[in-house]
């Protein structure tokens, strides 16, 4: 099943800002021809900062306390950012509303996409918490952090995931452990969180995300590998290049059924990781 998503404007904090920015956006375009790239970058960057500030105000005013409330706040925020950055997307398959979701990982936009389509809980490496903007956003939304090699980290992650499952929220994680540049559909999967999900007897659905540049950006020499997928650049350097894009379209595919792990995978986490990776890659074909 395909579902075309047009991120509609929601009410509440930020509605006036949407109108102001949309008017400015129209002023920056003349008969379909965008203005110079530096101006677009400044406009988009200012818009993103404003959206972030509005989300902060909403968080202070509403003070979400439960994990479900925080996940709902993050979902609204991510939908606004995607709309504000002219990122459209469609969803193929039924959206998982519970259990675990394993996905490929290309860029920080993956997080926005997974959250925008419905509230969810993320499991992420501890380094994300130290990342400007994204770290604060993830912490306030109830993200479960995993510190590799730290004593008790696996137990804490399992406990956090269990709370998400009990709250009826889908728990999303990226087993690659880092972002790739798209040279392969999915890099090797780490086995820890997959094994914990199996031990908790929770279902696990595969997801695959891909991106498509606009014809204008392709003509301008932009590439997914350099301008969308997040490789070795610093976050700020990559963001500055990204905000110069005209538009971007994403597709997120979900498997129709949960992953059916073999008996061997149930008893061997490495085999389980390989089977989960195969399920994700199958969605790229």
Please state what every model-predicted region is.
Residues 23-91, 136-141:
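A transmembrane-helix-recognition feature enriched in membrane-embedded lipid enzymes
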Residues 154, 161-165, 169-189, 194:
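Soluble extracytoplasmic domains of inner/organellar membrane proteins
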Residues 52-64, 84, 99-151:
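Catalytic core of membrane glycerolipid acyltransferases/transacylases, capturing the structured
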Residues 98-100, 168-174, 203:
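Residue-level preference for the first positions of well-ordered beta-strands
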Residues 2-29, 84-94, 167, 182, ...:
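Soluble, non-transmembrane catalytic domains of enzymes that act on hydrophobic metabolites at membranes
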Residues 125, 146, 174, 207-209:
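Generic beta-sheet signal
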Residues 133-135, 183-267:
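A cross-family acyltransferase "interaction/gating" segment
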């Amino acid at each position: 099943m395909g579902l075309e998503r047009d991120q509609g404007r929601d009410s509440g904090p930020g509605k006036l800002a949407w109108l102001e920015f949309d008017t400015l956006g129209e002023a920056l375009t003349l008969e379909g021809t965008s203005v110079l790239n530096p101006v677009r970058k400044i406009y988009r960057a200012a818009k993103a900062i404003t959206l972030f500030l509005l989300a902060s105000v909403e968080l202070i005013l509403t003070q979400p306390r439960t994990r479900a409330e925080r996940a709902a706040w993050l979902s609204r925020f991510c939908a606004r950012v995607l709309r504000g950055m002219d990122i459209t997307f469609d969803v193929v398959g039924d959206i998982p509303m519970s259990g675990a979701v394993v996905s490929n990982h290309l860029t920080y936009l993956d997080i926005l996409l997974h959250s925008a389509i419905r509230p969810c809980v993320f499991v992420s490496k501890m380094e994300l918490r130290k990342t400007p903007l994204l770290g604060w956003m993830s912490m306030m939304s109830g993200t479960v952090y995993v510190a590799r090699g730290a004593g008790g980290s696996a137990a804490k992650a399992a406990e956090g995931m269990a709370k998400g499952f009990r709250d009826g929220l889908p728990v999303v994680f990226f087993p690659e452990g880092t972002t790739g540049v798209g040279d392969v559909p999915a890099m090797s999967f780490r086995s820890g969180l997959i094994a914990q999900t199996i031990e908790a007897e929770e279902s696990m659905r595969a997801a695959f995300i891909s991106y498509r540049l606009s014809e204008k950006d392709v003509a301008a020499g932009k590439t997914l590998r350099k301008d969308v997928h997040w490789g070795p650049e610093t976050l700020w350097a990559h963001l500055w290049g990204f905000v110069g894009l005209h538009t971007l379209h994403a597709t997120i595919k979900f498997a129709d059924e949960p992953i059916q792990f073999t008996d061997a995978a149930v008893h061997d986490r490495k085999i389980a990781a390989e089977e989960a990776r195969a399920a994700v890659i199958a969605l790229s074909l």
